[in-house]
Amino acid sequence: MDLAGGVRFTLQLNKRAEAKEPISSKDQEEALNVLKKRLTGSVSNVDVVPEGKDRLVVDIPHETGDANQNIDEDKIKQIRAQLQKSAILELYLTHEQNNPVTIGKIERGEDVVPFSKIAEYAQPEEESGEEPRKLLLKEEILIKGEDVTAANAFNENGRWKINITFEGDGKKNLAEVSMKYAGDNVTKMAILLDGEIISAAVFSGHIPGGNCQISGDFTQQEANTLAVSMRNPLGVKPEILYEESFPPTLANEAINQGIRAGIWGLGLTAFFMAIFYRFAGLIALIGLSMNIILLFGILAIFQADFTLAGIAGVILTIGIAIDANVLIFERLREEMAAGKTVGIAIQTAYEKAFSAIFDAQITTLITALVLLWLAEGAIQGFAVTLTIGIIVSLFSALLVTRVCFNWLSATRKLNKPLKFTPVLSNKKINFLGLTKFSRFISVALIVVTILTIGIKKEESLGIEFVGGDQLRFNASESASIEDIKKTITETLNETKTPQIQKLTPIGGDSTIYSVRVEPGSGEKVKQAITIAGLAEGQIQSQQIGSVIAGEMAKRSLYALIAGLGVIFIYVTFRFEFSFAIGAIAALIHDLFIVIGITVLCGKELNLILVGAFLTIAGYSINDTIVVFDRIRENLRSQRGDVKDIMNTAINATLSRTILTSLTTLITVVSLLLFGGPALNDFSFAIIIGVIVGTYSSIFVASPIVYWWAKKKKVNLRREILDADQDDISPTATTN
C-alpha cells in the first residue's frame, strides 16, 4: 500500500441484539483478529487497525500499483461480504406445524404456536423486493456455531457445497436427531447464518461423525466466503461506514526517487567490485544480476506485494549476496598468493568459503522463517522477501559464479593469476587486547541509549505505536497534503510527524483527508485547519489506538524471542555454546545501540524503522558468523594460544568485513542521498546499523566468546575438535 495504494473500508462495530454490554476494547481486538484471518486467504498484505473505541479500518492493497485503476468489482464484493458477516451459525429443527398456511396466520396475528419462530431464507440480490420464503422453526437452538471445528467449500457434480464438522454438543445433537429422522423425506432442519436461512436439510441417514453438508445455489466465491466466515465467526455486527480508495502512502516522486537511488547504489556497487576485484568483480556482478532477476521473478510468480518492508529485505539480500562473493574472492586471493594454479585456487576457495557462507546465511534464514511463521503485516512482508532472497543468493554465489569461473578455466580463457587490489592485508592488530577500550565505547553507547529513551519515553514513539487523534474532513478546492502538513507543523511546533492520507469515496469524485496527529492535539489542529480554509463542512474527530498493538505486537515479540532462541541453538550446535553467547550478545548490543542513536538524532520509532531494525539484525548476525567461522577453522588447524589464534582470525577476515560494509553502505547511502524524505529515516538507521554491526563483529562478539570460555574454563579448541570427531564416520582414520 505504501507503493501501490489501495481500498479502505471503515467499519462500525455494533453489538448483537442479545448482547447486554456495549462494545468493549476486547470485542474490538477480537473482531480485528477474526477479520484478519478471514481476509488472509484472499488478500495479501491486508492491514486491519483499530479506530476509536468501536471501529476498525481495513486497508486492501491494489494489485497492479495503479491507484486510479478500475476496482475489480467481484473482488470488492467478496471482501465486502466477508467484512459484514458476523457468521453466527445456528441450526434449528423445523416445527411440526411448519407450512405456509400456519406461517401466514401467525404473521397476521390469527394464530399462536408456542415455542416457535419464523425465519426467512437469505435472498440473492436479483430477488430483492420479492417476498422471501419462510420456515416455522422450533425456538430452541439445536446446534450453535461455537461447535464448528472446520468448514470447507468443495465442488460436487458442478455444484458448490460447504462441508462442516461439529464437535462437542453439536456433534452429539446432530447424531441424535439424524438417527431419529433418518429416512424421512421431509425438511427437518434449517441452517441459519446471521439469522437467515441458507440451507434446509433432509436426513437421509444417521450422522455419527459430526459432519454435514450445506448445499444451495452457491457460486464458488460465495461458498468460499461462507466457509471462511464460518471458521471465523464474529461476536459483533460490523457495518461498513465508508468505502474509499487511496493513493500510495509514498508519493510517486518518492517512489521514483527510491528507484533512482537503487540504480545509483547498484551502479556504484558494480564500480566498487570492479575496482577491488577487477575481473573477478565482473563475474560477481553476473551473479548479483542473476540474484536480483530471480528475486523479483519469484516475487512476481507468487504475486507477492512489494512494500517498503520488502525494499528492506531486498537491501539485506543484496548485502548478503555481495558478502558471499567477497568471502569467496578473499579466499581466492589467499589461494592465489599461496602460488596455486587458477583452477585449483578457484576450487579450494569455494570449498573453504562454503562453511562461512552456509552458516551465515542459514542463521539469517532461520530468523526470516521464524518471522514468516509468527509475525504479521509489514514484518511478514520483510520475511517473505528475505527468505526468497537468501535462497537465490546461495544459488547465485555458489553455482552461477562458480560455473562462470569453471567454464573460463576449462576453456583456458582464464589461465593467468587473477589480480586483486590489496586491502588491509597481513595486518596483525591485537583486537582482543583492545577489549577495555571497546568495552568503554559499548558501555558509553548503552548508557546514552538508556538515558535517551528514559528521558524521551513516549516522545520517541511514532503515532503507529502510541495512537493519537484522528480528523476526517472534506477538502476544499485549494487543500493539498503539503498545505495541511504545513498548517499542522506551524500549529503544534515540535510534534510527532502527522500522518495524512488522501481518500476518494468509491464511485464518488470528492476528496477526503484523514489526518492522524499526536494525542490531545486534535482540537487545536481542527481549529487551525478550519481557519486556514482547508476543509469544507464539519471536521470529524476521535481518538485512535496504536496500529502496532494487541495481537500483532505480541506475535512480533514472540517472533523476535523465538528467532533469537533458534539462532542460539543453531550456533551452539554448529560452533560451541560460548560462540552462541557471543552472537546473541552482539546482536542485542547492535539493536539496542542503533535504536538509541536513532532516537538521540530526533527520529521517531515507526513501522518504517521496524523494517530497518530487522535488516540490521540480519546484517549483524551474518557478519558475526563469518568471523566465528574463521576462528573455528584456525582453532582446528593452528597451535598456540587461543587469544592469538582469535586475533589472527579477526585480522584474516578484516578485509572481508570492511569491504562488505563498504558495499552495503554504498547502496544505503545512495538511498539516503537520492531516496528523498520518505526513505531518509530508513536509510539513516541502516547506515548506523552497518557501522555498529561492523564494530561489534570485530570488538564485541569475539571478545565475549573469549571472556565466557575463560570464565567457564572451556577449552574452545578441544570442544571444536571433539565436535568434529563426532562427525567422522567409524571407518574414517585421522592422523
Q: Could you tell me what each predicted segment is?
A:
Residues 1-735:
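A structural signal for conserved, well-ordered secondary-structure elements
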